[in-house]
Amino acid sequence: MKFFKLLILCSSFSLAQRVDKDLEAFRKVESEVKNNLTEEIIKINDNFFMIKPIGGVAGNIGVFISDKGLVLVDDQWEIIEDLILETINSISKKDISFIINTHFHYDHVDGNKAFGKKGIPIISHENVRKRLKRKTKLYGHPQHNYKMIQDKYPDFALPTTVYNSTMKIYVEDEEIQLLNFGPGHTDGDTIVFFKNNNVIHAGDSFVTYGYPYVDLNDGGSFKGFINVLNQIVAISNDETKIIPGHGAVCDIGDVIKLKNVLQEHYEITEKGFSQSLS
C-alpha cells in the first residue's frame, strides 16, 4: 500500500512539473507584460478611442462610449487589470456595459478573467468559447520560436453570449455588427463594425507588424485570411478607421496593401506546389 501511495505521489509530482513546463512560455510573456507594458490612448472621434499597448505582447482595445456605458473590444491581460482600468477611466468614468472578444488568443482575451469576475457580459463567436474551455497549443507565431500553451479558462471568464455567423447589437443609435467570414486567423474570428461611427476593430484578422500569424492548429486558413481582408475592404470606405489587432489605426488602403502582398505570396506558393517545387 505504501508503494502505491508513493507511486501516486511521484506521478502527481511529475504531472505538475509537466504542466508547469507547458505553461512556462506563457508565464514568461505574462511577466514581460506585467513589468514592461504601458498604454497609449488614441482618440478616433469623440465617441471612440483605441488603447494601444507599448512594450509588451497585447492586443489593441477598442473603447466605444455611449450614454449608457462603455463597450470594449478585447481586454488584454488579467495581470494588468489595474492599468487597463486606470487607462479606461482616463477616457470615461462610465461603467463597462459589455466586452466583445475578437478571437480566443491570450493577448486579446486574458482580461476576461478579470472582467468576468465582475459579472460583465462577454460576447464572441461560438468557437471562442469552445476553445477557451480547453488547453490549446499555439505555435509558429512570427514573434516567438517556441510552442505556446494557453491553459483552459475558468467558467467565469468564458463568453456569456455567442453567435455563429453574424450578430447585430444596438446601443442607442449605434449599430454594432459582429461578423464572422469563416476561417482566417483562427476559426472563430469576429470583425466588429461600429456602423454609424464608421470604425472597424479587426482583431488579428488584420495586423501591421508584418507577415500575419495564421493559427493553423486552431482552424486558421491562409486562403481564408485573404478572404477576410477582402470582406473588410468590402464593408469599408475611404473614411473608415480600422483598428488592427496590433499596431496603429489604419484605413482601407492599408488593408488592401496587406491583402495584395498575401495574395501574391499565395499564388506563387500555389504555383510551386502545382509544379512540384519545394
List PLM regions with ranges:
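Sec-dependent signal peptide recognition
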Residues: 1-9
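Hydrophobic h-region of N-terminal signal peptides that target proteins for export
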Residues: 8-16
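Sec-dependent signal peptide cleavage junction
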Residues: 16-35
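Conserved beta-strand hairpin/beta-sheet module of binuclear metal-dependent hydrolase folds
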Residues: 42-88, 192-204
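Metallo-beta-lactamase
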Residues: 43, 69-70, 77-79, 129-260, ...
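Divalent metal-coordination and catalytic microenvironments
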Residues: 47, 64, 74, 88, ...
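Active-site metal-binding motif and surrounding structural segment of the metallo-beta-lactamase
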Residues: 67-71, 79-124
